[in-house]
Design a protein with these regions (language model features):
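Conserved SAM-binding loop of SAM-dependent methyltransferases across substrates and taxa
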Residues: 56-65
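Conserved class I S-adenosyl-L-methionine
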Residues: 44-56
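C-terminal substrate-binding/active-site "lid" region of AdoMet-derived donor-dependent transferases
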Residues: 113-162
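A short SAM/SAH-binding and catalytic strip from SAM-dependent methyltransferases
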Residues: 101-115
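Conserved SAM-binding motif I beta-strand of class I
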Residues: 67-72
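S-adenosyl-L-methionine
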Residues: 1-44, 73-99
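Structural motif
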Residues: 52-54, 106-110, 133-136
Length: 162
């Protein structure tokens, strides 16, 4: 995880440009993005990454991969991401991989129905490392798959090790 003056200046431009840009920097958002970066820190051989639920691309900015594709359903977010990264707009279950990325990241598991998630999960290419992230915040109106605990999270996200 590396960023300097140029990146910090760009993030401040994001906050000034978009009314909801500051939300990408809430403490819980930074904590979850930092966790992903720390988990992937020693995967030096990774070069390519697809981020589902890329939002404004802050996680992409924090990762140190030369090839990152940002995926989101909202054009507004992708307009910002497109300044630095290849983008794809649409429902995550409709995404088609052209190549096998080294890592697939889904940070929006709580925002999609089980049907959409299952279809998306089935498409993860064999050999791709994947990171799945969600939360237990049932109060947000868009959280349709928040989880009570890690056991529930593992079960509905196909992370069972049985």
């Amino acid at each position: 995880m590396r960023f300097g003056e140029k990146q910090l200046t760009r993030w401040m431009e994001l906050v000034r440009t978009y009314d909801d840009g500051i939300e990408a920097f809430w403490p819980s958002q930074i904590k979850s993005k930092t966790w992903i970066c720390n988990e992937l820190e020693f995967k030096e051989h990774f070069r390519s990454c697809v981020i589902f639920g890329s939002w404004y691309g802050v996680l992409a900015d924090m990762l140190d991969f030369p090839e990152i594709t940002c995926v989101d359903k909202e054009a507004k977010y992708l307009e910002w991401c497109a300044q630095k990264y290849p983008i794809w707009q649409g429902c995550i279950s409709n995404y088609e991989y052209n190549d096998v990325p080294d890592v697939v990241i889904n940070t929006i598991t709580e925002h999609v129905s089980q049907e959409v998630y299952d279809k998306w999960f089935e498409k993860i290419p064999v050999g791709a490392y994947y990171v799945i992230q969600g939360n237990n915040d049932f109060s947000h109106k868009d959280h349709v798959r928040a989880c009570e605990d890690l056991n529930m999270f593992a079960s509905i996200n196909h992370m069972d090790h049985g």
